[in-house]
Every structure is written in C-alpha cells, then in structure tokens.
C-alpha cells in the first residue's frame, strides 16, 4: 500500500485534500529539507535564519519587491483591521523565541527588505514546525493551500539567493 493510500484511510481530513493541496505539502517537505540542509546547514533556528538574511542583505540581493506577494498574503492572513488575527496565535511564535520582527513586519511597522525576508522565513519555519510536529493535523490540514503555495515560493527564492551569495564568495576567492 502506498503512503498516500494509507493516509487517505487513516489520517483525518487527508482524503478531502485536493491533488493541488497534497502536491503543495509534498513540495514543502522537499523544499524545506533542501533549504535547511543547504542554506541553514541543518541548523534551523530564528538566529540562523536572521544571520542568513543578513548575508543576503549585505550582498545587495534584498529589494522591497523581493518577497512582496508573500508579504502581502501573510499580512492579510495574520493582521487585519489593526489587530493580529486569531490565526496569528496558531503560528506558535512563542516556541521560537517570540521574534518581534514578525509582529513588526505584519503590522506594517517595519518595511525594511531584510526584516520582511526574516519575518517570512520565520513564518515558514513555524509552518515547518507545526506541520512536522503535528499541529496542522489538529484541523486536518484545512485552509493550507495558499499558506504552502507562498511558503514554497519563499523557500525557492531563499535557495536561489543563497546560491548567488555562494557563487560570489567563490568568485572572490579564485
């Protein structure tokens, strides 16, 4: 029996997910693994994310529009009408040191490209924690399509940025 067939029979809500939703979840698992291994050197944390973003910023890669679509989506999901939404608490930022940068970016208090990149990657990191530690199963993976679509875009861009920085470093040492 394939894992998908087994999940359809045994995982609450899995059989109700569309092929697109299932694909996005699979893509996320693979992209996160690549990102954490290649970019964060198998040491994912808020600190390593922020250090990585600083390298990108120093290399001149971060512009205001770099992560604009994802930033707009996450702002709309987690901050509306001047307050953080009920979904914001489900990120469980307290489990990752409660980084203020996420609040500042989502509320519009900080629009610096490096802050936006850090905040988005921290949100994606929390998606990883919530998915792989089981919290997302509490609500049967419902309403996750856009979350993982944007998270995947952020991860792909992050891997590309990291490779550019690595190429620049290699070019300087030759």
Listing of model-derived features with the role each one plays in the protein:
Residues 26, 115, 119-122, 146-149, ...:
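A generic "alpha-helical surface" signal
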Residues 1-108, 115-116, 137, 174:
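Amphipathic alpha-helical interface elements
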Residues 138-145:
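Short conserved catalytic/interaction loops centered on acidic-Pro-aromatic/His motifs
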Residues 146-174:
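Amphipathic, Lys/Arg-enriched alpha-helical patches that create a basic surface
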Residues 107-109, 113-119, 162-170:
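Repeat-unit-sized solenoid/scaffold elements
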Residues 117-138:
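Histidine-centered, metal-coordinating catalytic motifs and their short helical/loop contexts
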Residues 40, 44, 129-136, 159-167:
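Charged/polar positions within long, soluble alpha-helices
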């Amino acid at each position: 029996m394939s894992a998908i067939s087994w999940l359809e029979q045994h995982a609450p809500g899995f059989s109700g997910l569309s092929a697109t939703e299932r694909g996005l979840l699979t893509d996320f698992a693979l992209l996160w693994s690549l990102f954490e291994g290649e970019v964060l050197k198998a040491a994912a944390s808020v600190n390593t994310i922020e250090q990585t973003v600083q390298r990108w910023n120093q290399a001149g890669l971060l512009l205001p529009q770099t992560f604009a679509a994802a930033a707009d989506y996450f702002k709309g999901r987690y901050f509306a009408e001047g307050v953080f939404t009920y979904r914001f608490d489900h990120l469980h930022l307290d489990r990752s040191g409660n980084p203020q940068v996420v609040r500042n970016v989502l509320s519009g208090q900080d629009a610096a490209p490096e802050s936006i990149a850090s905040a988005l990657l921290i949100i994606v990191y929390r998606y990883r924690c919530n998915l792989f530690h089981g919290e997302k199963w509490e609500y049967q993976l419902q309403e996750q399509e856009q979350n993982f679509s944007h998270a995947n875009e952020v991860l792909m861009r992050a891997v590309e940025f990291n490779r550019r920085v690595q190429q620049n470093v290699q070019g300087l040492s030759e």
